[in-house]
């Protein structure tokens, strides 16, 4: 009985696939247009970010396509941040509590017109990492790419003007990549927030970028509005 059921289901799936293929074939130009958009879009990202889709395509990352850029509106957060966001200076921050790999976390921020959290001062770093969820690690916008390993000792923040990464709370100080978990397969930095009673036990460490963590997004109005 079960066997027959699965048999029917399977041929049903085959039929669906066949129909879908027919539709795609019939739609002529569409696939061409789609690939054109996905090829152009990373180029626009390069102006703003310290890394782009080519870096994200290395083995330690998931190679996922980015959404098409929305026609962006001017962001005015001089008064308030959107509901659920945290405010610090001219930036708004979103604590993402869906468990995501680094590349998906970055994309999720991008969909909210934000980047992963980049600290422009140690005060900002302390204030914002303190809002991430207790006893969890959260992705931040800090990566040491294997292909820059020879030329760069320090990891790269996602946007310009950030603090010297060696000054933040690495697990092992003074900072060096290897003692803090970095390897060819562990490029992405995450901030671990210890429970409040053990605050000094919070730290930053490198992990494989495919690990599933929380994440912190930052929408810096200066950066967001420099896009247009
Ligand atoms: C926002 O970005 C600008 C330009 O990089 C920077 O000077 C400023 O410190 C940032 N503000 C915050 C709160 O991150």
Curated annotation (Swiss-Prot):
Q: Looking at the keywords, is Transcription present?
A: no
Q: Which PROSITE patterns match?
A: C_TYPE_LECTIN_2
**SS bond partners:** 109-217, 188-209
All copies of the C-type lectin domain together span 88-218
Q: Name one GO cellular component term.
A: external side of plasma membrane
- The region annotated as signal peptide is 1-18
Any one GO molecular-function label of the UniProt entry: pattern recognition receptor activity
Keywords of the record: Disulfide bond, Glycoprotein, Lectin, Proteoglycan, Signal
Q: Which residues are glycosylated?
A: 27, 220
InterPro entries hit by this protein: C-type_lectin-like (IPR001304), C-type_lectin-like/link_sf (IPR016186), C-type_Lectin_Receptor_IMM (IPR051379), CTDL_fold (IPR016187)
The UniProt entry's GO biological process terms, in alphabetical order, are:
immune response
Among PANTHER family, the record links this protein to: CD209 ANTIGEN-LIKE PROTEIN C-LIKE (PTHR46746:SF9), KILLER CELL LECTIN-LIKE RECEPTOR SUBFAMILY F MEMBER 2 (PTHR46746)
Q: What is the name of the protein in this document?
A: C-type lectin domain-containing protein 88
Q: Which organism is it from?
A: Caenorhabditis elegans
Q: Which gene encodes it?
A: clec-88
């Amino acid at each position: 009985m079960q066997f027959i059921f699965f048999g029917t289901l399977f041929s049903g799936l085959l039929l669906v696939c066949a129909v879908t293929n027919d539709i795609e074939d019939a739609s002529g130009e569409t696939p061409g247009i789609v690939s054109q958009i996905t090829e152009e879009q990373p180029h626009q990202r390069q102006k703003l970010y310290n890394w782009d889709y080519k870096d994200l395509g290395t083995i330690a990352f998931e190679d996922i396509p980015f959404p098409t850029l929305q026609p962006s509106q001017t962001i005015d957060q001089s008064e308030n941040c959107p509901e659920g966001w945290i405010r610090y200076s001219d930036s708004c921050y979103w604590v993402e509590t869906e468990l995501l790999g680094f590349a998906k976390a970055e994309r999720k921020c991008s969909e909210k017109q934000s980047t992963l959290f980049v600290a422009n001062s140690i005060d900002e770093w302390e204030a914002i990492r303190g809002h991430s969820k207790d006893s969890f690690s959260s992705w931040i916008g800090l990566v040491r790419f294997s292909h820059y390993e020879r030329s760069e000792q320090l990891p790269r923040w996602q946007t310009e003007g950030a603090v010297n990464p060696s000054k933040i709370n690495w697990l092992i100080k003074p900072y060096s990549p290897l003692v803090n978990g970095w390897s060819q397969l562990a490029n992405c930095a995450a901030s671990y927030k210890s429970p409040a009673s053990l605050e000094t036990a919070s730290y930053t460490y490198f992990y494989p970028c495919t690990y599933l963590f929380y994440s912190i997004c930052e929408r810096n109005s200066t950066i967001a509005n420099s896009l247009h």
